[in-house]
Amino acid sequence: MKKKRVLTGDRPTGKLHLGHWIGSIMNRLQLQNDSRYDCFFIIADLHTLTTKTRKEEILQIDNHIYDVLADWLSVGIDPEKSAIYLQSAIPEIYELNLIFSMLTPLNHIMGIPSIKEMARNASLNEESLSHGLIGYPVLQSADILLAKAHLVPVGKDNEAHVELTRDIAKTFNRLYGEVFPEPDILQGELTALVGTNGQGKMSKSANNAIYLSDDAKTVQEKIRKLYTDPNRIHATTPGRVEGNPLFIYHDLFNPHKEEVEEFKTRYRQGCIRDVEVKARLAEEINLFLNPFREKRSELVAQPKFLEEALQQGTEKMRTVARETMEEVHDHLGLSRKWRTILASSK
């Protein structure tokens, strides 16, 4: 049976954190190791430009790409099983994005909730939204359809992006002939992990993240400062467990479930100090992160391996991209005669 192609990835904005692990990485590892799927993982550096256009920000992207590569491979993304590629190294993406932009009504894009969220996160008002930021869902559609992905793992907040991609595929296929599969949403990406400050999801920009590469001392310090129940002034004050980051993290990263339930009971009764519960959490998170940190140290010491992993996956995607665009041009028919003449004169 032919494998279904899966496309997912990250913008290279820095090191990955526990929120990435919970929100996407666990699911990606399951997909990679499932023989029914052929996984393509994109490092979406072009998407970084939607909110980061200052020269100093752009120059940081090279290092961030190394960070993403090192983090992916340290947690088990395998370049022998999956294609890891760099978005900007695939020139066909630019071309397909332009073609799709001609087929996509603006009101379809502006109805996507994440456009406004990205603008808020970048402190942009409506008047200062760039053409690229408004159009980035179309660029995402080009990423997905160029790879001819059948499945796209996303959370609830990004389902509208895949729906737009399906609409674009339908429009192209109806106007010019069948080229693109209509990708399905693959449920499995989990709810965002709350940040260490208890305010919104864990993210680099909010400075509330525990990184997969944080050393043990850093993890201990971040857990020591972890937001808990603000109404619990003393250890003898009964505390709230529900929605408390301290116990959200314990539920996710402490495998000793009986211990966690005992902590919850004593916390509700005011019979245990925050510092005790936090100390155990820090121990378990460090145990969880140890193999990733060790593997990452090995990978960082051999950058050539990281470069070859990216080169290998990018070459695979280039082959797919060329084949897809040949079909696009055949069906679109744009300047077909002259393209043939110019190609034969080389």
Swiss-Prot record:
NCBIfam families hit by this protein: trpS
Subunit record text: Homodimer.
Annotated residues for binding of L-tryptophan: D143
Keyword Cell membrane among record annotations: no
Motif 'HIGH' region per UniProt: ranges: 12-20
Annotated compartments: Cytoplasm
Gene3D superfamilies (UniProt xref): HUPs, Tyrosyl-Transfer RNA Synthetase
InterPro entries in the cross-refs: aa-tRNA-synth_Ic, Rossmann-like_a/b/a_fold, Trp-tRNA-ligase, Trp-tRNA-ligase_bac-type, Trp-tRNA_synthetase
Listed name of the protein: Tryptophan--tRNA ligase
Gene behind the chain: trpS
Entry binding sites for ATP: R11, P12, T13, G19, H20, G155, K156, D157, L193, K201, M202, S203, K204, S205
Family from the record: Belongs to the class-I aminoacyl-tRNA synthetase family.
EC identifiers of the protein: 6.1.1.2
HAMAP family reported for this sequence: Trp_tRNA_synth_B (MF_00140_B)
Reactions accelerated catalytically: tRNA(Trp) + L-tryptophan + ATP = L-tryptophyl-tRNA(Trp) + AMP + diphosphate + H(+)
Function: Catalyzes the attachment of tryptophan to tRNA(Trp).
PANTHER family: TRYPTOPHAN--TRNA LIGASE, MITOCHONDRIAL
Keywords noted in UniProt: Aminoacyl-tRNA synthetase, ATP-binding, Cytoplasm, Ligase, Nucleotide-binding, Protein biosynthesis
GO molecular function, one term: tryptophan-tRNA ligase activity
UniProt short sequence motif 'KMSKS' region, positions renumbered to this chain: 201-205
Organism the protein comes from: Chlamydia trachomatis serovar D (strain ATCC VR-885 / DSM 19411 / UW-3/Cx)
First-listed, main subcellular location of the protein, grouped into a coarse class: cytoplasm
GO cellular component terms attached to this protein's record: cytoplasm
